[in-house]
Structures are given as C-alpha cells and as structure tokens.
Amino acid sequence: MLTKYFDELKCELGQALTIPHKPYHPLIKQVKRDIKSMAHITGGGISENLPRALPDGLAASIDLSSWDIPILFKLLQKLMEVDVNEMFKVFNMGLGMILIATSKGAINIQSILPEVIVIGEIQKRNGGEQVIFG
C-alpha cells in the first residue's frame, strides 16, 4: 500500500507520509509575546495534546469548518475505514501546532504570520470534555 500511487496525493502514499513538516520554532519566535499557551499536535492528535495546554477550568471549542483537512488524512480515513472522531484522536489533521492567545494577541499573530488561522475559542469548562469539536 505504501508504494501505491494516488492521484489525489500526486505521489505514492509512503512518500506523502514522509514529507517533513514545517519547522515551527522560527515562526513561534516571531510571535512568542502574544502566545499564552501552545500544543504541539503529535501522536494522540488534537484530543489528547490540546488539553495539556489548558488549565483544568477551561475547554477549547474547535470549529471543524475553520480549516481544510489535508487530502492525506481524508485518504487515510477512507483506506483504514476509521471514524472521523478516531482520526482526531490519532492524527493532527493538518494542525501541527495550536497556539492559544487572547483575541488581541490572535490579531497580532495573524498580522505577522498571515497563514495562521483561528480555529476556535477558549471557554469555561463545566464538566465534560476539555476539547469540544463542532
């Protein structure tokens, strides 16, 4: 399967899986004064990594329509026949780093790094999950 060429990827699956991610350090260095917290989304996906960046009394409400999930993850989901909720528990779904900032900080971050998108908001947690997908 790894050596199979997929038109939607324009390469073999194995090649797509080994493309290095963008280094975050130079970008974060530019906006560190506006960052309140951050989460590197690695194994465990958003569901397991983002809560580590939040105090107990807060939750992150994530708007799933705020970014385009890369075709690689859509293809993996189809090939593995995995539920989308499971995908968010395992993969970063295209979000390798999540920064948490105030509204004003987010505006400043976007003025410096225009590729940064707002994917949700932090809210008080009244029990329940610490990451809410909607």
Region spans (language model):
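Glycine/GP-enriched mid-protein hinge/lid loop-to-helix segment characteristic of carbohydrate kinases
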Residues: 1-2
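Glycine-/charge-enriched secondary-structure boundary and capping motifs
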Residues: 5-134
